[in-house]
From Swiss-Prot:
Transmembrane segments: none
Effect on the protein of changing E156A: Loss of interaction with EMC5
A GO-annotated cellular component: endoplasmic reticulum membrane
Gene3D superfamilies tied to this protein: Tetratricopeptide repeat domain (1.25.40.10)
Annotated signal peptide: none
Organism annotation: Homo sapiens
Subcellular localization, as worded in the UniProt entry: Endoplasmic reticulum membrane
PANTHER family for the chain: TETRATRICOPEPTIDE REPEAT PROTEIN
Effect annotated for changing A122E: No effect on transmembrane domain binding of tail-anchored proteins
TPR repeats: 87-120, 155-188, 192-225
Name of the protein in question: ER membrane protein complex subunit 2
Modified residues (N-acetylalanine): A2
Residues carrying N6-acetyllysine: K255
Bilayer topology: Peripheral membrane protein
Length: 297
């Protein structure tokens, strides 16, 4: 097999820099990382200096993802020799157990890490990832709640918990998680949109009014958010037809729905469709949105 350096006429320095760029971008192009990284390790390890260790880690994770356990094990052994007893290396061992579906061994290893260092967030998150991989959402929810008791500012964890509650159809708790996120990220249109979707799914006049409000807020933050625009149309339409709504509320929401429909129509026209095609496309969208439910992004 041709070497990467010969195939693409690149130097080892360029290959090293490419690996760094992929790390910084958190790229998951595992096949390319394995190809470039394996050549760096085999041919240029002596030239890489201290960069070799982060490259071993990077290549190992990519190798697990790519199904190259032989390469992953080689990298892990090199890291163990250099950093015996390191929690970071132990976590990599746990990730290899996960790739081999030795979930119990991985959980035990992460538990030992946490006994020695209760603040090790990486080990906690790996445990949660295992529960999710096993389809044990209830246990994953419990683990995440325990984690958030100690690390309340972890926004990624709050969003992950919201997604798990949505999967379990516990919309009230999902809404609470998203409220926490909106408090710290008031300008994030996606959080506003997802909160609106949760409220829409819960149903009832009060929730529908909140849904419409937050779909509108999502649009205010990003006027190109078509999902929020569809949501605004549907929530306003449902409020307008709700028998518990006052006459004024119905009238106002008919206006909101009409405005949203006109914006959707304009968006279709702007996309280059003819008026006839737009009419039928919009009708199809409206029919689809009659069954609007939360879907995973």
């Amino acid at each position: 097999m041709a070497k990467v350096s010969e195939l693409y006429d690149v130097t080892w320095e360029e290959m090293r820099d490419k690996m760094r760029k992929w790390r910084e971008e958190n790229s998951r192009n595992s096949e390319q990382i394995v190809e470039v990284g394996e050549e760096l390790i085999n041919e240029y390890a002596s030239k890489l200096g201290d960069d070799i260790w982060i490259i071993y880690e990077q290549v190992m994770i990519a190798a697990l993802d790519y199904g190259r356990d032989d390469l992953a094990l080689f990298c892990l052994q090199e890291l163990r020799r250099q950093f015996p007893g390191s929690h970071r290396v132990k976590r990599l061992t746990g990730m290899r157990f996960e790739a081999m579906e030795r979930y119990d061994d991985a959980i035990q290893l992460y538990d030992r890490i946490l006994q020695e260092d209760p603040t090790n967030t990486a080990a906690r998150k790996r445990k949660i990832a295992i529960r999710k991989a096993q389809g044990k959402n209830v246990e994953a929810i419990r683990e995440l709640n325990e984690y958030l008791e100690q690390f309340v500012g972890d926004q990624e964890a709050w969003h992950e918990l919201a997604e798990l509650y949505i999967n379990e159809h516990d919309y009230a708790k999902a809404a609470f998680c998203l409220e926490e996120l909106m408090m710290t990220n008031p300008h994030n249109h996606l959080y506003c949109q997802q909160y609106a979707e949760v409220k829409y799914t819960q149903g009832g006049l009060e929730n529908l009014e909140l849904s419409r409000k937050y779909f509108a807020q999502a649009l205010k933050l990003n006027n190109r958010n078509m999902r929020a625009l569809f949501g605004l149309y549907m929530s306003a339409s449902h409020i307008a037809s709700n028998p518990k709504a006052s006459a004024k509320t119905k009238k106002d929401n008919m206006k909101y729905a009409s405005w949203a429909a006109s914006q959707i129509n304009r968006a279709y026209q702007f996309a280059g469709r003819s008026k006839k095609e737009t009419k039928y496309s919009l009708k199809a969208v409206e029919d689809m949105l009659e069954t609007l439910q939360i879907t995973q992004s």
